[in-house]
Amino acid sequence: MQRSIKIETHFLRPQYKIEEKIKERGDEQQRTTNVHADVTNWHLQLDDTYKSITGHIHENYPQHTIKELWGCTYRKGDFTQAHNHYGFDRAFVWFVDTSSTCSPLIFPDPEHPWMPDIHVITPQNGLLVVFGGCELHYVPPHVNNYERVVMSGNMRLNT
């Protein structure tokens, strides 16, 4: 029997030009992470530019603290290797500027790899997806010319 994953979704309209701010930062990680795309530094939660997402997270998950927040810009051929966010209670992806033809966020079933993926999240501007930090996920190679801009983050339970 295929296992289930608890995924919570919210909608938060991206504020004006937030995608430009992410793109302006460029690839601060120099493609050294699981994300083979342009990735900003890990600490955008400290920048008021991104207070719409941090405020939304704090309002909806008051028992958690955002420990890391970063932006990603995927171009044709970019992808993210399968990984999880071990050591964090929750992780999230916020689709800032995408189209439904952009590569999805996929949650495979590592216990039953012959089974269909557990969840395939089609990008939609403003969609915020929150999931357990231990859940395996990936993004297949981006196949079109529309830049896929997202913000991702990690949260820990307050102690």
Language-model regions, residue ranges each:
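Non-heme Fe(II)/2-oxoglutarate
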Residues: 1-63, 69-72, 79-80
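Catalytic core of non-heme Fe(II) oxygenases with the double-stranded beta-helix
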Residues: 65-141, 146-150, 158
